[in-house]
Amino acid sequence: MSESEAEETKISTEPVDNAWSMKIPAFRQEDNPHGMVEESSFATLFPKYRERYLKEVWPLVEQCLAEHHLKAELDLMEGSMVVKTSRKTWDPYIIIKARDMIKLMARSVPFEQAKRVLQDDIGCDIIKIGNLVHKKEKFVKRRQRLIGPNGATLKSIELLTDCYVLVQGNTVSALGPYKGLQQVRDIVLETMNNVHPIYNIKALMIKRELMKDPRLANEDWSRFLPKFKNKNISKRKQPKVKKQKKEYTPFPPSQPESKVDKQLASGEYFLNQEQKQAKRNQERTEKQKEAAKRQDERRNKDFVPPTEESAASSRKKEDGSSSSKVDVKALKAKLIKANKKARSS
């Protein structure tokens, strides 16, 4: 190993501000000269409609995996793909990458794109969206939002995240750098939760422009990003008069008094039938007297003479209003006009 390579492989213990800027150290054959001790294998099933395509490209798949000392098998009877390590395999993680490649190919990703996952700085993410929305109509509508008219929305997501994105059935397959995969997952999940992807696309476009300015590298970008308010108003009708909740008490409410309890409290319970009847008659006559008294007061209200003080005060008001209403000048002009008529006659 040369001095320059030794300097590159030195492990830094200093704090890192941006983890995405760190370079992933390369894993070479010299790092694992003895190879793998045990054989590892992964298998995945594929649908019937992918059988013809996989049969055509399988020689290319075997050739690609042979470069990494891996074996590949295609079982058309069972409908499965298998990848295995060999005695010459020296990279312990390449079998995981090969497993991801055959998973992507089973999800209708073309071989030219799927083989990119074997690179160190490229990863993949298969996002399951089938169980995020309960109604099928809503699911189809929101999934179509991801694609957009003529695939425009999907193309813009690919350009902004540097990822290959494929919407297929109940899954969204993404392939690209790890930071881009994180952004794709956020956009997909928010879209299925009824947030239009154009909002996240706008935010990514603004972030891309801000990254070009070195002065804003250590600043908070939230003030530049658009803030969208939810305009979906609840369709539930609110009551005009809302009942206020009573204060919580750990004790149960007191038991309401029964008729017998009320009779015991008033002493009526111990009376015989005749005494009870007499008491009821007495209460009835008292109520009738009160009602007759109120009726007489209402009838005699119009015949009650006003008090002297009120009569005097009303007279003063009338005098004041009449004196204030008299116009002296108009009265004088009227008298002069009457005198002129008398003289002329």
Curated annotation (Swiss-Prot):
Compositionally skewed regions (Basic residues) per UniProt: 232-245, 331-345
GO CC list: nucleolus; nucleoplasm; ribonucleoprotein complex; small-subunit processome
Gene Ontology BP term (one): rRNA processing
InterPro entries given in the database record: KH_dom (IPR004087), KH_dom_type_1_sf (IPR036612), KRR1-like_KH1 (IPR041174), KRR1-like_KH1_euk (IPR048550), KRR1-like_KH2 (IPR048548), KRR1-like_KH2_euk (IPR048549), rRNA_assembly_KRR1 (IPR024166)
Region feature (Disordered): 232-260, 273-345
Phenotypic consequence of gene deletion: Homozygous mutant larvae show arrested development at the first instar stage as they fail to increase in size or develop into the second instar larval stage and die 2-3 days after hatching, without morphological defect. Mutant larvae show an overall reduction of most intermediate and mature rRNA as a consequence of abnormal pre-rRNA processing. Mutants show defects in rRNA processing and aberrant pre-rRNA species. An abnormal cleavage in the 3'-end of the pre-rRNA occurs within the presumptive 28S rRNA but it does not lead to accumulation of a truncated 28S rRNA.
Domain of life of the native organism: Eukaryota
Coiled-coil region: 270-298
Pfam families per UniProt: KH_KRR1_1st (PF17903), KH_KRR1_2nd (PF21800)
Gene3D superfamilies named in the record: K Homology domain, type 1 (3.30.1370.10)
Basic and acidic residues bias locations: 276-302, 315-330
MF GO annotations: RNA binding
UniProt entry keywords in alphabetical sequence: Coiled coil, Developmental protein, Nucleus, Ribonucleoprotein, Ribosome biogenesis, RNA-binding, rRNA processing
Localization (cell): Nucleus, Nucleolus
Sequence similarity: Belongs to the KRR1 family.
PANTHER family: HIV-1 REV BINDING PROTEIN 2, 3, KRR1 SMALL SUBUNIT PROCESSOME COMPONENT HOMOLOG
Subunit structure: Monomer. Component of the ribosomal small subunit (SSU) processome.
Name of this chain's protein: KRR1 small subunit processome component homolog
Phylogenetic placement of the source organism: Eukaryota, Metazoa, Ecdysozoa, Arthropoda, Hexapoda
